[in-house]
Amino acid sequence: MKQTILARRYAKAVFSIGADSGKYGEYNDALQAVANLYMTNPDVVDALTNPLYPLELREKVMVGIVKSMDIDAVMSNFLNLLVEKKRAEILPEIAEEFQAMVDDAQNLSHGSVISAVELSEELQGKIQQTLEKLTGKKVELTTSVDPSIIGGIVAKVGDLVLDGSIKTQLAGLKESIKGRE
């Protein structure tokens, strides 16, 4: 079950400490690394969140992770607090919320472009510039190819979706023809 509100609160607390000390980038790297460990190793999740294991054992596991990743004292205390408060299961959500806060602080958005064919570097650059003008933020794009859109592109940045695909245009034309019958 997603606990976004709680994750956002934890992320906001750590972000404010990181922003005050100028280490939010370092904290973000640490959180992303631990969240990645969660995603790739289910045994770690079990060792940190399973209530059948004594709290002392779960804390030792987190201490081991912190030492192996050479994480600074503040972040180490935060990660240990999550284990102590039985909130370690929301660590990936906290990392996601923290990343969003870092992106916002750096005036950065992540976007995606789907096209029917592979786009040239030049065209990707033009699309990126256009999206940056529309959003007022620096945009990091990921591109993918989906032949089912027939032609054109679908660009997404945050809540903004620009669908210029032939597939969507044909669907709109079909609906307008149906409406006249």
Curated annotation (Swiss-Prot):
Pfam families: OSCP
A GO molecular-function annotation: proton-transporting ATP synthase activity, rotational mechanism
Signal peptide positions on this chain: none
Domain of life, per lineage: Bacteria
GO cellular component terms listed in the entry, alphabetical order: plasma membrane; proton-transporting ATP synthase complex
Compartment(s) of residence: Cell inner membrane
Keywords tagged on the record: ATP synthesis, Cell inner membrane, Cell membrane, CF(1), Hydrogen ion transport, Ion transport, Membrane, Transport
Membrane topology (UniProt): Peripheral membrane protein
Oligomeric and partner information: F-type ATPases have 2 components, F(1) - the catalytic core - and F(0) - the membrane proton channel. F(1) has five subunits: alpha(3), beta(3), gamma(1), delta(1), epsilon(1). F(0) has three main subunits: a(1), b(2) and c(10-14). The alpha and beta chains form an alternating ring which encloses part of the gamma chain. F(1) is attached to F(0) by a central stalk formed by the gamma and epsilon chains, while a peripheral stalk is formed by the delta and b chains.
PANTHER family cross-referenced by the UniProt entry: ATP SYNTHASE DELTA CHAIN
Known role: F(1)F(0) ATP synthase produces ATP from ADP in the presence of a proton or sodium gradient. F-type ATPases consist of two structural domains, F(1) containing the extramembraneous catalytic core and F(0) containing the membrane proton channel, linked together by a central stalk and a peripheral stalk. During catalysis, ATP synthesis in the catalytic domain of F(1) is coupled via a rotary mechanism of the central stalk subunits to proton translocation.
HAMAP family named among the record's database cross-references: ATP_synth_delta_bact
Similarity annotation: Belongs to the ATPase delta chain family.
Protein name: ATP synthase subunit delta
Gene designation per UniProt: atpH
